[in-house]
Amino acid sequence: MAASLWMGDLEPYMDENFISRAFATMGETVMSVKIIRNRLTGIPAGYCFVEFADLATAEKCLHKINGKPLPGATPAKRFKLNYATYGKQPDNSPEYSLFVGDLTPDVDDGMLYEFFVKVYPSCRGGKVVLDQTGVSKGYGFVKFTDELEQKRALTECQGAIGLGSKPVRLSVAIPKASRVKPVEYSQMYSYSYNQYYQQYQNYYAQWGYDQNTGSYSYSYPQYGYTQSTMQTYEEVGDDALEDPMPQLDVTEANKEFMEQSEELYDALMDCHWQPLDTVSSEIPAMM
């Protein structure tokens, strides 16, 4: 049975042939591509639906190439893919996620997903967080639909090797307090990892968090609506992602503390009168 993926963030010049070639370049074969256009103006709405032979192929493609550079795109863009629901109600089954830290730059979404799904079948996706230039920030998230498997993964994979070149560091990703929003359309699918935060602070905080690619929520109506109506992005900054176990260089911290203390001491001493040369020296007049 054929299955489709939603593909967004398209430029006007990206037609069916361009999309098909882009997938072919990544080693994926698509059955068809449907570019959605505004019903009144005929202008492309900025998204399309890509059909695959079956659901397994579509899922494999989603995990393999989502977030990777889009071949031939000018300016440079990345694949922005999601499941297409075609009128089905959103999947409201509970999700249990893990924060995955200490990821090396070579780890992508597909590798993260495959590392967990081969042992924990309820794993539903993996997301490596990227900066604005597309470089990994060194951490990501994985989702599970089975809480027991999430807990097993947390225990069994803590410090595991085989995902990149460093042992992985895991902690529970805690969902933020949910914000109630009206559902305007029945055709909606949420695929956001920005709803999670960590219970400790300053995970790579020096880089800042302005993540705009590969992590989003959207809703799309029936064909013919404009892109602004079709797609609503969650404005949730990545500054909410925090470090479960920050590294502290004790030696460096002590050095900085001593330097600051010496500066304070010198400043205090400079506020006093200068010492007299001898006991018989004349005391300077007050200014």
Swiss-Prot record:
Report the principal subcellular site.
Answer: nucleus
CDD domains referenced in this protein's UniProt entry, alphabetically: RRM1_SECp43, RRM2_SECp43
Q: Which UniProt keywords apply?
A: Cytoplasm, Nucleus, Protein biosynthesis, Repeat, RNA-binding
Gene Ontology molecular functions: tRNA binding
Signal peptide span? none
In its keyword annotation, does this UniProt entry include Nucleus?
yes
Q: Which PROSITE patterns does this chain map to? A: RRM (PS50102)
Which Pfam families does this UniProt record tie to the protein? RRM_1, Trnau1ap
Instruction: Spell out the coiled coil positions from the record.
Output: none
State the superkingdom. Eukaryota
User: Where located?
Assistant: Nucleus; Cytoplasm
- GO CC terms: cytoplasm; nucleus
Q: Which residues form the RRM domain?
A: 3-86, 96-175
Q: Which GO terms describe its biological process?
A: selenocysteine incorporation
SUPFAM superfamilies reported for this sequence = RNA-binding domain, RBD (SSF54928)
Name the family: Belongs to the RRM TRSPAP family.
Q: What is the recorded function of this protein according to its Swiss-Prot or TrEMBL entry?
A: Involved in the early steps of selenocysteine biosynthesis and tRNA(Sec) charging to the later steps resulting in the cotranslational incorporation of selenocysteine into selenoproteins. Stabilizes the SECISBP2, EEFSEC and tRNA(Sec) complex. May be involved in the methylation of tRNA(Sec). Enhances efficiency of selenoproteins synthesis.
Task: Please give the subunit comment from the record.
Answer: Component of the tRNA(Sec) complex composed at least of EEFSEC, SECISBP2, SEPHS1, SEPSECS, TRNAU1AP and tRNA(Sec). Found in a complex with tRNA(Sec). Interacts with SEPSECS. Associates with mRNP and/or polysomes. Found in a complex with EEFSEC, SECISBP2, TRNAU1AP and tRNA(Sec).
Q: What is this protein called?
A: tRNA selenocysteine 1-associated protein 1
Name the source organism. Answer: Bos taurus
